[in-house]
Regions:
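C-terminal region of N-terminal signal peptides and the immediate post-cleavage residues
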Residues: 13-16, 28-49, 233, 237, ...
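Trp/Gly-enriched beta-strand/coil motifs that build multi-repeat beta-propeller-like domains
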Residues: 669-927
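N-terminal export and membrane-targeting signals
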Residues: 2-22
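Basic/polar, cationic surfaces and motifs that engage anionic cell-wall
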Residues: 215, 221-281, 285-287, 383-492
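N-terminal catalytic cores of peptidoglycan-degrading enzymes
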Residues: 47-52, 241-363, 552, 558-560, ...
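Catalytic glycan-binding domains that act on GlcNAc-containing polysaccharides
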Residues: 48-231
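Intrinsically disordered, low-complexity linker and terminal regions at domain boundaries
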Residues: 559-601
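SH3/SH3-like beta-barrel superfamily modules
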Residues: 527-559, 610-666
Length: 927
């Protein structure tokens, strides 16, 4: 590369950094809700040595001559820029670049009974009798993970390229990014391609980075990487870092005639067939076929005909490597099957069974009849804690296609994990499985399906009878203790919350009558509420919620309601009479239906789950329409359909059935109103803004805080223009240290309360106090008052214009510098006009009644009382106890917050103070 070429390249990178800064500005109020800017972006003026991911990508790209967009897009498609604290994926990928390291001690060196049991999924006793465990073991032993495979040691290779240790690349983001950049450059050179400054020229390296041994997989990964480059990506990582990849629609990938592929000792090629798959996935097909004796590992059918409609899609993991799983699932002697298998490294989808046929995957015949099974590679590497981005994306694309094709609702009652498949009968406990397990990110997965679950929301009050979706965050805020075989695993984000018999972590863990394992065991889901499930609230307290769960009132930690999302339009189910009704693990027809069809009944067709009961007074969410009990006979190609109607319900972690004749249906209770509750906003020392949602109770006026966004330290004044309601309404203005005023309009969304800021204008640095005064002139718009440094008070009426809504200022009067605090409280006197509270330097509080006059709207002050200099913050959030009168909040110098109830007295309207609680000293702004 010539010296001038390198200068041009450097110039382009500087421009790229500027583009990142532009993206940062464009994300105000969107990427991080109401954040004034994206910190740590390339070109944002951060000091040299900055350790932000954005800077690490820029530095590594420069060092190894890799376009930064390529490096960032590859990382995003591997891990979404997550480090996972150095923990491996379920297939041995590490850190932000997804580099692999799998040694012999990381994977089972022999086939376990649990692996074999995973393939015994027919749920049919006569089929289970023929399950050949020895044959399955034999197949799996031939396909044990080859830890000498270079595809499983990209981390070691990349570490060598940067002369670093494997441990550093595993655990340090900067080392991981440098190693990934070096490996991309190495792959580009191996392909005989130039280290071009054009992103589109890097197709060979990107495809090779996928570690796919097949062209379809390599092309799929490259396609997604270049889509990220063209469309841009942005994210806030679990560590709280904001990262942005600016969109560059001009990039056109240059695909070589021979796409570089990873070498593999034994690559299984697909048969020539047309897959039932979206075109963009370019799926493989390797169908299981009967052997010469006619033995097969599935049941032939003609779905969705003959009443065999497809109602659900079941998510599995393989508990083994890709090659071994593919061999077992396509071997007619394997005993188990599934419709699809998704490889971890590149997201390649292989169809193994036509969807018209019944796969033996769920261990429950009703689910097998009416569901499609999708397996995901995962071979239980020690400490494996996350699934690859390519698996998530391919799976979501496939499942969305299948759901649309077969009319399957895209919700968590129809897109379920294997662990949510019901126990068929009391005798079927051995058929239960717990994949996809606690580390499958259901919240993210459902968002890829276009059905966001409402996780990471602001929460709110709940009431009994209300339907909620449980959405614990898949972040470091939710890292419950887990054990496997009694051995603790390291803390990491998980997709569940623990259930207790009382609202306390010190309470007794919930017990499932069918489980004997310890409550912290990952396989014991009887005391765990999984993300995405919908339940009926049995009781609600501030930070704890009880739901009806498996015949019990089960409590889980739900800070401020933030681990749930209200569900509207849901139907609840209750017992019709006073007597408890049976719960069924499958929906089989009544005995008479078999007789009428001329087929033999199984003998346990009427069996229920006897250790469960659905009692009067309890309530559960209906999980689908009522269906007639049915039972498919593959040998006769006939579906036995009964007359008894069964209703699926979310009874506990699983979907079960009750007889329609024994229950009644009703809508869930309406959500608690948020229009008569008011919030408090606080800023911590790092500049993060927090929202405290009002409860409407004077004794406990606020719910657990909710993070609005970072970057607010750049403002030296912030004031609400109106009361900030719990429903996300209410505007705010903020002044930068440069004197520029910005307007934040309320969105009406509690989880994203402010829209992107609007620039009002400069010159506001002349004021030492800005105060949103509510609607001063009864025109329906909130106004602003400002005090200049000489003590003159000015009124800015709101015209409704944008971006500057304020009319020319009007002088209210002088002498206001005698006060060291001005407080906007709203209407204190009941005349419909907003009043003003002021504290003088001796600690006396004064009330200024609004007369409606102009230009000075305030009457002669009235003395409230002395002693108020004990407080360093006083604000008037509005009516906090729902009695129709605005109250006062004050923080003393020790950090204790106090509530002053408005009694409607005059001139002193306040009752004796009530402590809200301590710990508020960490905030440098409360409004």
């Amino acid at each position: 590369m010539t010296r001038s070429h390198r200068r041009d390249r450097k110039k382009k990178r500087l421009l790229y950094g500027a583009a990142a800064a532009v993206v940062a500005t464009a994300t105000i109020g969107t990427l991080a809700v109401a954040s004034p800017g994206l910190l740590g972006a390339a070109g944002d003026g951060t000091a040299a040595g900055d350790v932000s991911l954005q800077s690490q990508f820029a530095n590594a790209a420069r060092e190894f001559d890799v376009p930064q967009s390529v490096l960032m897009a590859v990382s995003y498609q591997q891990t979404r820029w997550e480090s996972h604290d150095g923990e491996p994926s379920t297939t041995g990928a590490y850190n932000v670049m997804g580099l692999t390291k799998v040694d012999p001690e990381d994977v089972p060196q022999k086939v376990t009974d649990e692996q074999i049991d995973h393939f015994n999924g027919s749920g049919r006793p006569e089929i289970e009798k023929t399950f050949d465990r020895a044959k399955v073991r034999q197949i799996l032993e031939k396909a044990l993970v080859d830890t000498d495979d270079p595809r499983l040691h990209t981390l070691d290779k990349a570490a060598e390229l940067i002369d670093s240790s494997s441990e550093a690349v595993q655990n340090d983001t900067a080392a991981s990014i440098r190693a990934g950049a070096a490996l991309l450059a190495d792959y580009q050179k191996q392909a005989g391609a130039e280290l071009s400054d054009e992103a589109g020229d890097w197709y060979p390296a990107v495809a090779r980075y996928s570690q796919s041994p097949e062209k379809k997989g390599a092309d799929l990964f490259a396609k997604r990487v270049f889509e990220s480059i063209q469309e841009g990506e942005r994210a806030v990582t679990l560590d709280g870092e904001q990262v942005a990849l600016p969109a560059d629609p001009s990039v056109e990938p240059v695909k070589p005639s021979n796409v570089p592929l990873a070498a593999t000792p034994a690559s299984t090629r697909a048969a020539a067939a047309v897959p039932e798959c979206p075109a963009g996935l370019s799926c493989n097909v390797k169908l299981t076929v009967p052997d010469s004796a006619g033995k097969k590992n599935y049941t032939a059918a003609d779905r969705p005909n003959q009443g065999l409609d497809i109602r659900q899609i079941v998510i599995h993991d393989t508990e083994g490597g890709y090659d071994g799983s593919l061999q077992v699932l396509t071997d007619p002697n394997g005993g188990g099957s599934a419709h699809y298998l998704i490889r971890a490294a590149d997201g390649l989808v292989t169809q193994m069974l036509e969807n018209k046929n019944l796969a033996w995957h769920a261990g429950n015949w009703t689910h097998n009849m009416h569901a499609i099974g999708v397996e995901h590679e995962g071979y239980a590497i020690k400490e494996g804690s996350w699934y690859t981005e390519q698996q998530y994306r391919s799976s979501a694309e496939l499942v969305k296609f299948l759901a649309n094709k077969y009319g399957v609702p895209i919700d968590r009652e129809h897109i379920i994990g294997h662990d949510e498949v019901a126990l068929q009968t009391d005798a079927g406990l051995a058929n239960l499985h717990w994949d996809a397990g606690p580390y499958w990110d259901w919240n993210y997965y459902m968002s890829l399906l276009g059905a966001p679950q409402g996780d990471k929301g602001a929460g709110g009050l709940l009431r009994a009878g209300q339907v909620v979706r449980v959405v614990p965050p898949f972040t470091t805020a939710n890292q419950p203790k887990l054990t496997v075989g009694g051995t603790a695993v390291s803390a990491r984000p998980a997709n569940f919350g623990y259930l207790y018999t009382t609202p306390s972590t010190g309470g007794t863990p919930l017990k499932d009558p069918y489980f004997t394992s310890g409550p912290s065991e990952g396989s014991n889901y009887g005391n765990k509420v999984r993300a995405g499930g919908t339940y009926v609230v049995a009781e609600a307290r501030t930070d704890w919620t009880a739901i009806w769960y498996a015949g019990q009132k089960a409590w889980f930690f739900n800070p401020g309601g933030q681990y749930t999302a209200p569900v509207t339009g849901a139907t609840t189910v209750k017992v019709a009479g006073l007597t408890a009704v049976k719960v069924f693990g499958r929906s089989f027809p009544e005995t008479a239906a078999y007789t009428a069809a001329g087929l033999s009944a199984p003998g346990d067709e009427n069996a229920s789950l006897t250790k469960f009961s659905f009692a009067a007074g309890q309530s559960y969410v209906k999980a689908g329409p009522a269906v007639k009990g049915d039972d498919w006979f593959g040998s006769a190609q006939k579906n036995v359909v009964g007359t008894t109607l069964f209703v699926p319900i979310r009874f506990h972690h699983k979907i079960v059935w009750v007889k329609q004749s024994e229950i009644t249906e009703a809508p869930g209770a309406a959500p608690v109103s948020a229009t008569d509750r008011y919030n408090l906003i606080a800023r911590d020392a790092s500049g993060v803004l927090w929202q405290y949602q009002g409860t409407g109770s004077g004794s406990t006026p606020f719910l657990t805080r909710y993070r609005v966004g970072p970057g607010w330290q750049d403002y030296d004044a912030v004031t609400p223009m109106t009361a900030l309601r719990a429903d996300g309404t209410g505007d705010m203005v903020a002044r930068g240290k440069d004197g520029v005023l910005w307007y934040y309009k309320g969105t009406g969304k509690p989880s994203a309360p402010f829209a992107g800021r609007l620039r009002v204008g400069g010159g506001w640095g002349v004021y030492d106090k800005l105060l949103g005064a509510r609607d001063m002139n009864a025109d329906g718009r909130p106004d602003l008052i400002a005090r200049d440094k000489t003590g003159v008070l000015w009124l800015y009426t709101n015209t409704g214009a944008a971006p500057n809504p304020f009319a020319t200022r009007v002088r209210v009067g002088g002498g206001w510098n005698t006060y060291n605090e001005l407080i906007s409280t709203g209407d204190m006197t009941g005349d419909g006009r907003p009043d003003l509270i002021a504290r003088d330097k001796t600690g006396v509080l004064w009330l200024y009644k609004n007369t409606g006059g102009t230009p000075n709207p305030y009457a002669t002050r009235a003395k409230v009382g002395g002693g108020w200099n004990a407080y360093d913050v006083m604000v008037g959030p509005s009516d906090l106890d729902r009695d129709g009168r605005p109250d006062l909040i004050a923080r003393d110098t020790t950090g204790v917050l106090w509530f002053y109830k408005n009694t409607n007295g005059y001139p002193n309207p306040y009752a004796p103070r009530v402590s809200v609680g301590g710990g508020w000293k960490g905030y440098n702004l409360i409004v």
